[in-house]
Structure formats: C-alpha cells, structure tokens
Amino acid sequence: MSDKQQFIRNFSIIAHIDHGKSTLADRLLEIGQVTNDRTKKDQILDSMDIERERGITIKANNATFDYLADDGNTYTMNLLDTPGHVDFTYEVSRSLKACEGVLLIVDASQGVEAQTLANLYLAMEQDLEILPVMNKIDLPAADVEKTKIQIEESLGLDSEKAVAISAKTGLNVKAVLEAITKEIPAPKGDPKGPLKALIYDSYFDPYMGVVIKIRVFDGSIKKGDRFLIMSTGKDFTVNEVGINRIALTPTDGLGAGEVGYLIAGIKKVSDAKTGDTITLFSNPTKESIPGYKEAKPMVFSGLYPINGEQFDELVDAIEKLKLNDAALIFEKESSVALGFGFRVGYLGLLHMEIVQERLEREFNLDLITTAPSVKYIIRKKSGEVEEIDNPSRFPEPITIESTEEPYVKATVITPNEYVGNIMALAMDKRGIQLDTVYLTQDKVQLTYELPLAELIFEFYDKLKSFTRGYASLDYEPSGYRISQLVKMDILVNGEPVDALSMIVHRTKAEQRGREIIEKLKDLIPRHQFMIPIQAAVGGKILARESISALRKNVTAKCYGGDITRKKKLLEKQKEGKKRMKQIGNVEIPQEAFLAVLKTNN
C-alpha cells in the first residue's frame, strides 16, 4: 500500500427512501468545502430535477473532497451516493463494490425500514465496514434509545459505534467524518500491478461523449493510455482523466484506491456498462472484477404518442434517453387502437414512471401507456418454449401445455396494528406467507412470495393506504412458478380492442374484466344502436355491459292518421339500426383509453 492510499477513504451512504441520505451528503460536502454559495443547493448530488422533486436518487453519483481530521492528517474522502429504491439495486451493489465502508442511516423517528435491511444485506455481501448513523434527532418524535435497540436487534450492529446526528441542522455531522477516518479501512491494492478498475456508473454528455466513473483497484491510468473494456474486448484511448469535486476536475491520472472519471470519446453508454472492468491494452489484468451482470427488465408496457404525428419525436426521444440508461430496452410495435408506438422494458415500476415522466418533461411529448405486464414463459405441446411480455403474442389455448409467471420474495415491515390488513391484501394478491418476525414490540417483518404481476397492479398503493403510509416494502426476484394464465380480451360491439387485452390469472379474469367494462360503459358515448361491451377468455364471455341506443323519434312528423304509417317508419328505423350495427364502427374516445389504462396502472 502506498502512503497516498493510507489517507484515502471510499465510502457510500445507504438508507431507506426519505431517511435523509442526500441531506447528509450535502452537509459532508459543505464541511469538505467543495460547495460555495453559488453551487450550494439542496440535494447537490441529485442532478436531475425529477430526483429533487421526488426526493429520490436515481443515478449513482459521487464527489471527492479533502478533510483535515483531528489527528492532524488530511484525508481524501470519496463519497458515492447510491439510489435507495429497489428498482436500482444493481446500481447500488456496483457502487458498494467501489467502497470499503458504508454509512447506514436510520431515521430516529421511523426506525428500521424494509430497504434499510435490503441495502444492509448488500453491504454485508461485499464485506464492508458498516457505520450506523441515527439521523433526524432534532425531531420531537425521535427516540434515540429505541433506535439503538433496533440497530442491535434488527440489524445486528454495535450501537455503541452509532453516531446520532441531525443532517438538516448539521448537528454532530463532523463526528461522522471522524468516525469514517477511524472505522473505515484504507483501500488495499497494488499500485505497481496491471490496471484493474471497476466501472460503477457511466452517463452520456452531449459535448464529451460517455463519461465513465471508475474505481481503480490495482495499477494506474493516465491521459493517452489505451485501455480495454473486458466484457466486450473493445479498446479506447483516454482523452481526459480526473476526479469529481462536484464539477469534473482533470488530474494527471488515477492510482490504486482512487475514485474518479475518464473520457475517451465513447459514443454509447452500452459500450461502458456499469459493473464492467477496465484494464490497460499493453498490460492487461488476468481476471475481471466479479459480479458483472446485464440488467434485466422485469416490467413491460406499450408506450404510444397521444398525437400520432409525434411518433418520430418519440423515436428520437427514446433513443436519446437510452444513451443514459443502459437498462432500458425497447422495440417498435403497432396497435389498431393506438397507432404506432414502442414495447418498452423497465427494471421495475419506479423506473417505468421515471422513464415516462422524463420523456414527457424533457422532450415535451404526450404519451399513453398500456397496462404493465411481466415476462411469462409458455410451454407448448409441440415442445417449443416461448417467452412473452405482450398479450398480442399469447398463443392459442389449445396449443399450450403449461404457463409460468415470475414470482418475487417481498418483505414488508409494518407497525403491529396493521398486520391483519397486510395479510388480507397478500391473500387477495395470491401471496404465500413465508415468515413473520417481530423486530420490536410494535414492528413486524412479514415475508411473502407473490406473483410479480400482482405486485405491479395496485399492491404498493393499497399497502400504503391500508397502513396509513407506515409500511415499507422491498422485493427481489425468486424465479418462475407454473400458473393458470389466460389471455383476456375486451370486445366492443363484438370487436376485440387490442390495447386493452391482458394476461391474467384464471381466478382474477372475471373481476378484472368487470372493472374494465364498467369503466368503459361510462366513457364510450351512446350511438344510434346498442353497443355490447364484453370481457372474454377464449370464446367464453365472462362479463357484459350494454350501452343503450340513442332513440330518434321517427314518428314525430306523423300527425294522427293511419297507425300502419307509423309502424312502417318504425320498421324502417329498426332495419336501419340493424344494418348500422353490422357495419357501424364504435369510436372509442382517447379519454376512455386513458381512464381504463390508469386503473390498470
């Protein structure tokens, strides 16, 4: 280990959403004097507007600052800010790989939450030093002693090491930096060995191309070096290398233990994927850093412009967004009802919301989304196996041997009094209870296995409303299970509406179908003829509603006179309606689609 390495500390902050992670990062950077009055703003490391508004971190970020400790030494602090949401767990695991220790924040007024535990396990897997920090001790509801007990019992950490702070007011934040210098070890690594560096994030800049954020484990890299990306074998030359002091700051190079960035004229983020290993072309390392994997989408939906003329703009926008989001996958598709659009794959529901919001906000598009679905496995009688995420590709029932759907292991942490509500919700969502653990007298951890398709359909909203917002949720994939799945079509005037088709569990088909057709009945305007709206599986109608016809008074012009004259006019009208019904197209207004798809989302 070089002398320089002794005084480097690489650490990350992990926490449940809203426990004060970005606020603590702001205070640490103020002490490190990398922010001044001009650059100072809340959530410095959250660079997107959407991150600030929602109060969440989406992209992993970092900052380097110097700290003069009480022992008289100046330490180089590398803070890696990580996303807190379950959708971005892979990004968190790669950022943690670049660290030697973590600050684990627990809100002293809320206690331990589901994602606190999930992120703690990620840190333990990487064998990192874990430093507990109790935040928000300035709040009247804060209970430091109770939080200490939870840190001992629920997390299995030494509460004596826990630092009690208020990130908002800055109270005791300096003690956190002192604890980092004492508790978190200096980075190991051979400064003279062949280069081995981890890409823990990358983003696209319109002027510089792809900016790669790296942590160097062995060796060093400088401007002009030719390097290899190990998973693809592609090589590039370094144009600029440096560290991030909020603004990118070029340096002579990066050595073992250091965290920084490099620019090499790379055009696509997919050429420098998170988790990949960089080594020198002239003296490559033998093995890459373990743990790299491709991000797999879990949730899929159709994305269409409300105004069909905006399709070319949507193509342009989604390709630009892809430059910054390697996990996003998409392919063109068309729908009779909605026109041309895309089938898009996301990491999870939050990722889906963020992609849509960014497309609408940054590219000024009006979009409509079809109901989210997951990837199903269909085993056919012919021996073929198909993976489908789009109801339109669901094969004929007669050809199917079995169907499988993805399940997740979901952990819910809730106050004691809401356990009954959650059990009822999980039962309704076809959940299987695996475990119940009392974390404290009034906090319970429930573990369930449930279908991902049920989790993405209203589960989170219902969980929050059933527990008045107190419950927290975390989930991870747990493989596929055989399930009785069917394709449900919605027929309007006998014609299936492709945008409203969905794959559902046989036991849920009637209930879901009824919800949709009741909504459509209120939204489709009346026509001159009666319109049946039906939910059907195969040839079987599960539910039906009718929109009654508008009645035109054709006998109004007959004043008294012969009854046969009136009958003749009524018969003529009847004939006309019959013909109209056969050839009449029912226009489904855009609002009807939006409203129905909203229920599905």
Swiss-Prot record:
Gene name of this polypeptide: lepA
Pfam family, one: LepA_C
Topological category with respect to the lipid bilayer: Peripheral membrane protein
Name of the protein in question: Elongation factor 4
GO BP: positive regulation of translation
One term of GO molecular function: translation elongation factor activity
Family: Belongs to the TRAFAC class translation factor GTPase superfamily. Classic translation factor GTPase family. LepA subfamily.
UniProt catalytic activity: GTP + H2O = GDP + phosphate + H(+)
Compartment annotation: Cell inner membrane
Enzyme class (EC, first level): hydrolase
Keywords: Cell inner membrane, Cell membrane, GTP-binding, Hydrolase, Membrane, Nucleotide-binding, Protein biosynthesis
Protein's job: Required for accurate and efficient protein synthesis under certain stress conditions. May act as a fidelity factor of the translation reaction, by catalyzing a one-codon backward translocation of tRNAs on improperly translocated ribosomes. Back-translocation proceeds from a post-translocation (POST) complex to a pre-translocation (PRE) complex, thus giving elongation factor G a second chance to translocate the tRNAs correctly. Binds to ribosomes in a GTP-dependent manner.
Gene Ontology CC terms, in alphabetical order: plasma membrane
EC number from the UniProt entry: 3.6.5.n1
Residues given in the record as GTP binding sites: 18-23, 135-138
Family annotation (InterPro entries): EF-4, EFG_III/V, EFG_V-like, EFTu-like_2, G_TR_CS, LepA_C_sf, LepA_CTD, LepA_IV
Residue ranges of every copy of the tr-type G domain listed in the record: 6-188
